[in-house]
Amino acid sequence: MENEFDVVVVGAGISGIGAGAHFNLKCPDQTYVILEGRESFGGTWDLFKYPGIRSDSDMHTLGYSFKPWVHKKSIANAPAIMEYLEETIDEYELHPHIRYNHHVETANWSPKEGKWIVSVTDKVNNKEIIFKGKLLYMCSGYYKYAHGYEPKFEGSENFEGQIVHPQKWSDDVEYENKEVVVIGSGATAATLVPELAKKTKHTTMLQRSPTYFVSAPDEDNLANNLRRFIPDRLAYFLIRIRNISFQQFFFKRARAYPEQAKERILNMVKEELPEDIVNKHFTPSYNPWDQRICLIPNSDFFESIKAKTSSVVTDHIEKFEEKGIRLKSGNFLPADLIVTATGLILESFGGVKMSVDNKPIEASDTYTSVSYTHLRAHETLD
């Protein structure tokens, strides 16, 4: 049948594209289709449009094992990552396998047929299509694409400016010469603040509590020099092994000796910023890797603080007012634009309703003792 395959892949983001390339490399006799609900490939890197969006892992470890990263910058922005993905699609001839605007609604395992019965909405023609596959490969990410996590802030309806979540950033967001407050201190905020600060009147990062930040160059000089003397693939392999090994070593040592790791990280930040700022705004109450450590390429966030184009406030929100945010300390933050970098909404299987023999299953019931990230079927980029 036309829509029967050996494998049905859900999602044409980084994982889905990687899956297709692996099938072509290792299972060329197997048929497969990649179903993508949006009009483009790329997943996260096509969805998010906020200023400065970039990776916060180096591309020698984030990239595919089978395709070298050859850009000068190893901490890459979204356009460079999209270019890399498009090259992968072209090189591994994935275009015929991808069906865009095909949103997967349900997936039912049929014991009788020994196949997954996948119900899909063709968004262009507004009709249901059934796909069948022996294997269902979920590469749909881990968060809800429709919208991000936005806490309810008292008085938000009274704020006279614009409120935007980074996941919904669009070209009509006006921030030049504005007073901007970014709520949050995770990876998105760390990316946004220094980039916005280049054009705003002032950008303030408002956080409830501090986060660990580590600065690193956005270019890997060793990788760039190696490519001058040895083949790209060999250089990539060597740098990939080096970086993965270093990251594993640092992680394990940080978990084994948390106080030493904490002291080392904070001393690095104190080389960038005054000690009083570090003590108040950059000293978390938890140990390194209890939560994610945020990467700062070329110290851009720290540089913007030193240039006084941005600042950090550690406090709690009392309410939004017409002209800004009232804090529980009583202080007031003026704002023309508020960016709620407050995170994502986790969603297993991309929101697809799963069932076995027409009996619904819940991921939270099935995976009660497995880390959520293990629900992602294809961790190509770790």
Feature roles, as predicted:
Residues 5, 9, 14-98, 207-208, ...:
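Beta1-alpha1 glycine-rich phosphate/pyrophosphate-binding loop at the start
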Residues 14, 19, 30, 40, ...:
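Rossmann-like dinucleotide-binding core of oxidoreductases
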Residues 75-138:
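Feature captures the FAD/FMN-dependent oxidoreductase FAD-binding
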Residues 102-104, 168-169, 316-317:
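Conserved SAM/SAH-binding loop
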Residues 132-141, 336-343:
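Short hydrophobic core segments
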Residues 150-160, 328, 332-370:
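Central helical "cap/lid" subdomain
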Residues 272-334, 338:
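Alpha/beta-hydrolase fold catalytic core
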Residues 373-380:
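Conserved small/polar residues in nucleotide/adenosyl-binding loops
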